[in-house]
Amino acid sequence: MANVVENLGKLERRVTISLPKDTVQKEIDARIQKLAKTVRMPGFRPGKVPVKMVAQQYAGQVEAEVLSDKIGQEFFTISRAENLRVAGQPSFEPKQEQAEGAYAFDATFEVYPEVKIGDLATAEVERSTTSIGDAEIDRTLDILRKQRVHFHARGEAGEHGDGGADTAAKNGDRVTVDFVGKIDDVAFQGGTAEDFPFVLGEGRMLPEFETAALGLKVGESRTFDLAFPEDYHGKDVAGKTAQFTVTMKKIEWPHLPEIDGEFAKSLGIEDGDLTKMRGEIKDNLEREAKRRTQSIVKNQVMDALLKISELDVPKALIEQDQQRLVEMARQDLAQRGVPNAKDAPIPAEMFTEQAERRVKLGLVLAELVKSNGLEAKPEQIRAEVDEFAKSYEDPKEVVRWYYSNQQRLAEMEAFVVESNVVDFVLGKAKVTDKEVSFEALASASAQA
């Protein structure tokens, strides 16, 4: 008998599942017989419990298990027979009217939608390009020098000088101070510290502290007012004005290493050759620029695909992705050391919009890949792994690391598929190239 699939909406369907009671009962009896061989009950040796007693105690549980298994099997059979592309998990409910000699259930579920992708020639994408020159290399070297800064006591002669004749604290100096804060001449909790270090100009301290410390010499003090906002977390001082006195204990000036052979060696250039060092920095910057431009243009391509595509999104898939995002959020909290992160009450509704976009995009990409043969080829995957491995000291070990784990390899395969999609769309869309600086590129990719 043909199965009747009811259309309940754009994607929602319903089908009736009928299970002969005698078939179900035979399976229940068989399982109880098997259970009787292992079940333990007081007063009986294992395997010697009468089947009738086992049935009395476990019949309900076994019946539920058998029905669940049989319903699932029958639904799978119907799905294949009717060529149903089921999205998510179906829900099963007993029918109000049961046929004689059979169990009847309604299976309600969603199917995958038809995906209509519009004309790719109408898609618009802005592609950023950037050039790496001496200015970008010099800027990177400046950052690397600052990462290797050494501080020396200002005014004391040393290997690198004394920091100049002016011994007052300047921006860039690391200072060590004592400070005392009072409200109405009474010290308050948290308002006092000794030997407190910070670097002037980094912005870690309140502006009032920075201003007070600037220009002081060792042993000098300065008093200033600090008004706490009404919503300050410390209730005892919220909305009040405190008088702070800061006393300079130590001033250390920053010494940046010279860009010489030793500096090059510290960056991994064994012979200290400065030309090689600049060449490697340029290669690294070009790889980073390529990665950032690819990421930005990929996001633009995905946005363009969503704009020209028409499809209904199965609610079941959105709900599944919401739960995945909730679990990812909990894992992130756990990695940050948040207590009881795995049980954090994170509402799935927070991720509704994000989940809908992810699911919709996944369906569009799957259709585009299938229709245009954009699957990842083994040689493409290997080429990407090799490219990624170049930035590590032992590329061969990185390659082995990828190919030793199917999940890592699957992630790289997904990346290649996305790259194939991006290249395919760029070959057909309206693409505008825009030259941007490396700094602007870094800022744009951080916001993407």
Swiss-Prot record:
Biological process according to GO: 'de novo' cotranslational protein folding; cell division; chaperone-mediated protein folding; protein transport; protein unfolding
Primary location: cytoplasm
Subcellular location: Cytoplasm
GO MF term list: peptidyl-prolyl cis-trans isomerase activity; protein folding chaperone; ribosome binding
Keyword Chaperone: yes
Protein keywords: Cell cycle, Cell division, Chaperone, Cytoplasm, Isomerase, Rotamase
Domain PPIase FKBP-type residue range list: 172-257
Record carries keyword Nucleus: no
EC number(s) from the headed UniProt entry: 5.2.1.8
Role noted for this protein: Involved in protein export. Acts as a chaperone by maintaining the newly synthesized protein in an open conformation. Functions as a peptidyl-prolyl cis-trans isomerase.
Record remark: domains: Consists of 3 domains; the N-terminus binds the ribosome, the middle domain has PPIase activity, while the C-terminus has intrinsic chaperone activity on its own.
Entry protein name: Trigger factor
